[in-house]
Amino acid sequence: MSNLTISIFGNKIFLEILNELKLFSNYKAIHYDDLDLCIKDAITYSHLVLFFVTQANKNFFEEFKSKNMPLILIAKSKNLKNLALDELMEKLDMPFSMLELKKTITILIAKCEFKKNSLIQLSDYIIDKNERKIKKDQLELQLSEKEINFLILFSKSKDPIN
């Protein structure tokens, strides 16, 4: 994720602040007014999303959450209280420092890389080495470590295994 793009939803002024400070010059930042376009681009182009949570847009959180994408929620702590976060989500209470934001972005990038490296595609199945699960569509099966190791061995083998 060295060429990371940060999608900002819910606060256009923050994009202007980032551009003015040039703190995140190694990242590209884009503001979105349209929720669907923000989610579509985040999924298609592997963007990290900064979602500024307000009382008015708090209900959009579930749409972001259902997409399983890297997301940083930024809000006053009262707006973040009852939001259950997934593994690819972080939250920042306002006010926050730019150093704190940069640290949170770095942590989330590391989580995404770790998650991406733990997934193996095997035909129509996805093997998650960390969670020791195999998934197909909406079905998932918990496996033992030995079963996971066998599946990984099979996935790496070019020839049939006797």
Tell what function each PLM region has.
Residues S2-I6:
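Extreme N-terminal starter segment of soluble prokaryotic enzymes
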Residues I8-D33:
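Two-component/phosphorelay signaling modules centered on CheY-like receiver
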Residues N11-F14, D34-D36, V53-N57, I74-K81:
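Short, polar loop motifs at secondary-structure junctions
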Residues E63-I120:
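Basic, amphipathic DNA-recognition helix from helix-turn-helix-like DNA-binding domains
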Residues P95, S157-K158:
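Short helix/strand-capping hinge loops at secondary-structure junctions
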Residues I161-N162:
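Short acidic, hydrophobic short linear motifs in intrinsically disordered regions
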